[in-house]
Design a protein with these regions (language model features):
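N-terminal glycine-rich flavin-associated loop
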Residues: 21, 46-78, 96, 102-137
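Short hydrophobic/aromatic-rich motifs at helix boundaries and adjacent loops
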Residues: 38-40, 100-103
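Generic beta-strand/beta-sheet core signal
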Residues: 33, 81, 101-103
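N-terminal accessory segments
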Residues: 1-44, 73-77
Length: 137
């Protein structure tokens, strides 16, 4: 699978970007170590593998908003990732982009059995949904 060629101007921003991201999400919320990034180089579709510049793991909606504003200002590509179980290639990282890891947003908000609909946060895995509705057929 061919992916877009990374932009060298974006890659050159990496260290400054990491500092700005760490100001928004402190502690272990920014992953930039090459070995740790391997866990994020693909989703459930493992044919394509590419480590992103960084992975950011926000815990609040405000942090998500601040990250998106920062990336917009710096023209950084953002790939949102929920639980990382997709087999469709929906969360394929880019070398000159970041992964916005939304796995901490993992609540099932509403189950509407009558309309066969479930409203969830992006970090909810399909298995969790199946288990939540299993007792009601």
């Amino acid at each position: 699978m061919l992916m877009p060629k990374p932009e060298s101007e974006i890659l050159a921003q990496r260290e400054g970007l990491l500092a700005d991201l760490r100001a928004i999400v402190p502690g272990e919320g920014v992953i930039a170590d090459n070995i740790a990034l391997r866990a994020y180089e693909s989703d459930g579709l493992s044919v394509y593998r590419q480590a992103p510049m960084a992975v950011v793991l926000p815990e609040t909606v405000k942090q998500v908003s601040n990250i998106m504003q920062l990336c917009d200002r710096r023209q950084i590509k953002v790939v949102p990732r929920g639980a990382g179980t997709s087999l469709s290639g929906g969360a394929l990282p880019l070398e000159d982009g970041i992964i916005l890891g939304l796995g901490k947003f993992n609540k099932i908000l509403e189950i509407d059995y009558e309309n066969r609909a479930v409203r969830v946060q992006p970090g909810v895995a399909n298995l969790a949904i199946s288990q939540a509705v299993d007792d009601n057929g």
